[in-house]
């Protein structure tokens, strides 16, 4: 639990029993590093005043928002008002809107940058794996390995199996919303629109082998395009044919719509919420999950006047994640980086006193810490495939500095 760094920990949710179950698992695994407070609280995080009251009651200094993306603005506002640090793992979404005009961060989070700056509030946006770690990978490549970066392709593959006919790995409502709207990518230094499943690629990847992925709209493209001088930034996600077929049928029938409909009995329902209600709870998938995940950045550019390519990536194992945390690897890769971000704020490395996306913060402390927390990073380039080494990063950075890049 890393409470040796983070101190007292309070877990809050609208459903108190979920918090109590988490605490029970932590205590059963004897995961606390030292004696301290580990408490559960019931909270409607959409209620800004209630969130502020809980912050005041617990005297917390860092709030990690691991809830639905619909909650971001309420929790962020409470943190700004109370002067405490804020971390989230995904971009804010309005439940009534799908796939808004890019850049998505400009529609919500970035509107609060001045308020964070004025109050000296540290707000780290998108500190999961993607977004999050992949942003740090992009910054690492740009800072240490290239004189000029021409393209960043972020590749996310779940090569595991949960054994169910059909299920999503996290909240179905959020999951499906990612794929029912326009696919936005950053190409030739401008926004480009495509349809879901319109464009695909196949890569030979470490450990998981040949994988087909599809161009997908995703959070990190919307900050990297603003913060890094890179003309092409794309996100690719792996989908099996079965998933695509079921998704397509649901979508064509209108069952993935967020707009209410009225049944013959006069009952108003949101089709997407009905689908969510009948699908397996993502938490129930973990015990039977097998296989591995791959998430990484394929970066291309120029180094010393020569075209170069770098793959920075992580491999995680579903069964290992369940053994440690009772969660599957997708939840594990999303949750561990957020804890690492909180630890870096507590240590001072990332306590920047303003709003920042992950690529705007030092990448090495983050990547290094994650390696010690169960998410090791590997690098593949012309020199071969090897574990990330912070000393190598420092050496590469000095080399680029000497050449005047």
List where the protein language model places each region.
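Adenosine-phosphate binding glycine-rich loop
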Residues: 109-157
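Short beta-strand element of Class I
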Residues: 8-10
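C-terminal catalytic/substrate-binding lobe primarily of soluble NAD(P)-dependent oxidoreductases
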Residues: 143-405
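Rossmann-fold cofactor-recognition segment
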Residues: 30-47
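Conserved Rossmann-fold cofactor-binding substructure of NAD(P)-dependent oxidoreductases
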Residues: 42-60, 67, 71
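Rossmann-fold NAD(P)-binding glycine/threonine-rich loop
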Residues: 89-121
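Helix N-cap at the beta1-alpha1 junction of Rossmann-like dinucleotide-binding domains, i.e.
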Residues: 15-18
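N-terminal Rossmann-like NAD(P) cofactor-binding module of classical short-chain dehydrogenase/reductase
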Residues: 55, 61-66, 79, 86-88
């Amino acid at each position: 639990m890393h409470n040796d760094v983070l101190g007292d920990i309070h877990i809050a949710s609208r459903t108190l029993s979920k918090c109590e179950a988490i605490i029970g698992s932590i205590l059963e695994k004897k995961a606390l590093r030292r004696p301290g407070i580990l408490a559960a609280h019931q909270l409607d995080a959409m209620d800004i005043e209630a969130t502020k009251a809980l912050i005041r009651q617990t005297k917390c200094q860092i709030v990690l928002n691991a809830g639905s993306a619909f909650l971001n603005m309420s929790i962020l506002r409470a943190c700004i008002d109370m002067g405490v640090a804020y971390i989230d793992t995904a971009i804010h979404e309005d439940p009534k809107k799908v796939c808004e005009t890019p850049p998505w961060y400009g529609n919500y989070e970035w509107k609060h940058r001045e308020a964070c700056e004025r109050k000296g509030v540290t707000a780290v946006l998108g500190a999961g794996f993607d977004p999050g770690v992949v942003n740090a990978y992009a910054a690492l490549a740009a800072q240490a390995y290239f004189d000029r970066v021409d393209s960043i392709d972020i590749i996310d593959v779940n090569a595991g199996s949960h054994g169910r006919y059909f299920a999503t790995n996290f909240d179905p409502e959020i999951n499906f919303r990612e794929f029912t709207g326009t696919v936005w990518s950053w190409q030739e230094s401008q926004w480009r629109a495509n349809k879901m499943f319109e464009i695909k690629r196949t890569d030979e990847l470490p450990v998981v082998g040949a994988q087909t992925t599809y161009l997908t709209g995703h959070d990190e493209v919307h900050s990297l395009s603003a913060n890094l001088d890179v003309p092409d930034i794309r996100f690719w996600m792996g989908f099996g044919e079965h998933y695509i077929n079921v998704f397509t049928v649901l979508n064509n029938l209108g069952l993935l719509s967020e707009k209410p409909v009225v049944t013959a009995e006069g009952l108003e329902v949101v089709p997407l919420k009905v689908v969510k209600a009948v699908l397996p709870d993502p938490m129930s998938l973990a015990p039977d999950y097998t296989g591995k995940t791959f998430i990484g950045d394929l970066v291309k550019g120029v180094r010393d006047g020569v075209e170069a390519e770098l793959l920075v990536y992580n491999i995680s194992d579903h069964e290992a994640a369940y053994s440690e945390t009772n969660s599957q690897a997708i939840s594990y890769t999303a949750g561990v980086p957020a804890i690492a971000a909180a630890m870096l704020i507590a240590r001072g490395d990332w306590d920047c006193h303003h709003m920042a996306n992950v690529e705007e913060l030092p990448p090495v402390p983050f990547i290094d810490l994650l390696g010690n927390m169960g998410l090791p990073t590997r690098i593949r380039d012309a020199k071969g495939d090897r574990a990330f080494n912070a000393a190598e990063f420092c050496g590469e950075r000095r080399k680029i500095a000497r050449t005047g890049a």
